[in-house]
Structures are given as C-alpha cells and as structure tokens.
C-alpha cells in the first residue's frame, strides 16, 4: 500500500529505510495511551507494595494469549515455583488460556498457593501501573507495545510473533534491541528453561 499512498506514517527509522525513504514518509513514532503517559513508577511501585529491593516481572502475549508461548510460560512458572524465586511475577494468560495454563503449570510442579509472589490472571486491568512498576516486561513486539515500553523506559524480553505480515514484529524488536532497550528471543528458540534463564539473566543485570 505504501507505494500508492500520498503519506506514510512510520514508528521507526528502520521502516523509512525499508520503504525506500522519500518525502512522503514521515517518522511520527507510535501513538501511546494517555494512562501510559500518566503512569508514575514511584507511585505504581508503592501501589503494589514493592520496596527498592523488590523486583517484578510482568508478562503477557496479548488479550487472547498465544497458545504456543503460553504452554512454554506454564513450564517457566513451574520452574519459578520449584526454584523459589523471590521476585514478583504477574502473567496474563489471555482469555483462551485462563483455565488450562494454571492447570498445566501445576502438572509440572507449580504450587501457586505456596508462592503468592507468582500470580496468574486472565487479564491485567491496571496495565499502565503494572508496566511502570515492572523491572522486566516479557511480551510480543507489536508497534503499540514497543511505543509504550519506550515511553516508560522499561527493559523487556521480546518474543516477536512469527505469524504477522513480513515478519514485522521481529523487525520492530530488532530496532529496539539495537538501541539497548530489550533482548529478543525468537519463538522457535523458546522453551520453559530458556525463558526462565533469560528472565534470571536480565533481572540480575540491574544496570540494563
């Protein structure tokens, strides 16, 4: 469509290059929700009872979830329980996985009652505050999400969806990774242990 458009608005400089440049291409950045703009990290962490030493991971794959990645996340959450991690982790399953993901995690050894710092929910209704308070966000790499991550200045582990036109999520993620804002993990390389190890490594790097 870009070749026939009078104006093309893009979120990333790399998109300008991919579209061949020219006067009709305008770098605007991604629109960001008002609640993201208003989010305050200090107030958000106070809201969730987090001290300066506490760490929180927020993970989600979109409102409907992603079955393949939710299966891996079930195993990752089980590893967190078995290893007794001290950080807080809130994972949004999406509607489709709300019933089976906790059950799958428990089958792999997760005990959520014994580890209240690990929370599984269908949907995160206060996402702006959760993201602002987080020390690490694990998610897909849609343009809107990346715009919010950049606005909040939160580090991320991005797993781009491979089921999108022209693999644009990986291109989005690589642009942010090049600037040091995230770590990219391809879906084909993901499994519960890899997810767990990546989360531990990123949380241990407090300067990132």
Residues covered by each model-derived region:
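Nucleotide-activated sugar donor-binding and catalytic core shared by glycosyltransferases
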Residues: 1-208
């Amino acid at each position: 469509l870009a070749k026939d458009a009078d104006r093309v608005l893009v979120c990333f400089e790399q998109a300008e290059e991919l579209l061949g440049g020219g006067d009709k291409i305008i770098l605007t950045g991604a629109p960001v929700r008002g609640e993201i703009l208003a989010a305050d990290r200090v107030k958000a962490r106070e809201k969730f009872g987090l001290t300066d030493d506490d760490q929180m991971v927020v993970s989600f794959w979109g409102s409907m979830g992603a079955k393949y990645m939710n299966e891996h996340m079930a195993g990752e959450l089980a590893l967190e329980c078995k290893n007794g991690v001290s950080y807080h982790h809130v994972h949004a399953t999406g509607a489709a996985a709300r019933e089976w993901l906790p059950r799958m995690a428990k089958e792999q050894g997760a005990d959520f009652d014994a580890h209240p710092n690990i929370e599984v929910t269908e949907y995160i209704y206060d996402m702006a505050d959760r993201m602002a308070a987080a020390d690490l966000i694990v998610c897909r790499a849609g343009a809107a999400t990346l715009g919010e991550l950049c606005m909040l200045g939160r580090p991320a582990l991005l797993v781009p969806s491979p089921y999108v036109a022209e693999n644009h999520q990986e291109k989005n993620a690589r642009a942010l990774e090049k600037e040091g804002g995230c770590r990219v993990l391809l879906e084909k390389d993901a499994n519960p242990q890899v997810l767990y190890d990546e989360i531990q490594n990123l949380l241990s790097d407090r300067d990132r």
